[in-house]
């Protein structure tokens, strides 16, 4: 699987240049509606970033004829598929806000280690050397979710009740087909997990604060 020419490669990371509502770690006392709004916006940014990165990696490294068969095998690769987390909006609406926050926290924390190796996956470090910023944004979202948990649980988040897991780090040996497939699978899981976290946060925000943007 030889690397092909990259087209519009910068698009994969344009969202990294967009301003965030506040700096990382900045979750002071504020209305619950603002906490939810900020967390949802952060999750949307990260989900779009994950989707763009996955798409760019696929275009660059995965032959088109192999994509369908590989994608069919990727669901079992994601450990998040083995936990009782809702798989979509309808299922999420059947869970309590505290449950959804705990699942969101689990998903975010499972990627804090692996994303620190993300920049090493790509040969063009000037473009993809942004792993630290992705990590910072994940930490920022983690803190936002923990702030929401403190508000809703009336105390500190009970992290001990969440089974913490993590994914393997990305493989830097891009000359190996096995490494390429591993990274492709990891990026697929990253995209899926960020989509789940975004969905959970949007469901919670919408049912607490009725608004026109609840249709998604």
Curated annotation (Swiss-Prot):
**Key words of the record:** Disulfide bond, Hormone, Metal-binding, Phosphoprotein, Secreted, Signal, Zinc
Q: Which residues carry this modification: Phosphoserine?
A: 131
Pfam families noted in UniProt: Hormone_1
Q: Which residues bind Zn(2+)?
A: 45, 198
Which PROSITE patterns is this protein grouped with? SOMATOTROPIN_1 (PS00266), SOMATOTROPIN_2 (PS00338)
Q: Name one GO cellular component term.
A: secretory granule
Spell out the subcellular localization from the entry: Secreted
Query: What are the annotated disulfide bridges?
Result: 78-189, 206-214
GO MF annotation list: growth factor activity; growth hormone receptor binding; hormone activity; metal ion binding
Q: Where mainly located?
A: secreted
Residues in coiled coil: none
Which GO terms are recorded in the biological process aspect for this UniProt protein? animal organ development; cellular response to insulin stimulus; growth hormone receptor signaling pathway; positive regulation of multicellular organism growth; positive regulation of receptor signaling pathway via JAK-STAT; response to food
The UniProt entry, under Gene3D superfamilies, shows: 1.20.1250.10
- So which domain of life are we looking at? Eukaryota
Signal peptide span per the entry?
A: 1-26
Tell me, what does this protein do in biology? Plays an important role in growth control. Its major role in stimulating body growth is to stimulate the liver and other tissues to secrete IGF1. It stimulates both the differentiation and proliferation of myoblasts. It also stimulates amino acid uptake and protein synthesis in muscle and other tissues.
Q: Which family does it belong to?
A: Belongs to the somatotropin/prolactin family.
> Can you name this protein?
Somatotropin
């Amino acid at each position: 699987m030889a690397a092909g020419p990259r087209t519009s490669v910068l698009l994969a990371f344009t969202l990294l240049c967009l301003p965030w509502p506040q700096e990382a770690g900045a979750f002071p006392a504020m209305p619950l509606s603002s906490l939810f709004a900020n967390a949802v916006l952060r999750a949307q940014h990260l989900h779009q970033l994950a989707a763009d990165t996955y798409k760019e990696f696929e275009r660059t490294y995965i032959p088109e004829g192999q994509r369908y068969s590989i994608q069919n095998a990727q669901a079992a690769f994601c450990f998040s598929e083995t936990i009782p987390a809702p798989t979509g909006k309808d299922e999420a609406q059947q869970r309590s806000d505290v449950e959804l926050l705990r699942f969101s926290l689990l998903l975010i924390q499972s990627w804090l280690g692996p994303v620190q190796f993300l920049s090493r996956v790509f040969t063009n470090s000037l473009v993809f050397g942004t792993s630290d910023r992705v990590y910072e944004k994940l930490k920022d979202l983690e803190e936002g979710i923990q702030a929401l948990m403190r508000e809703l649980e009336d105390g500190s988040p009970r992290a001990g009740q969440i089974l913490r897991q993590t994914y393997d780090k990305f493989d830097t040996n891009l000359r190996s087909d096995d490494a390429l497939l591993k990274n492709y699978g990891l990026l697929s899981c990253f995209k899926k997990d960020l989509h789940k976290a975004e969905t959970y946060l949007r469901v919670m925000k919408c049912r607490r604060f009725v608004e026109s943007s609840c249709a998604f």
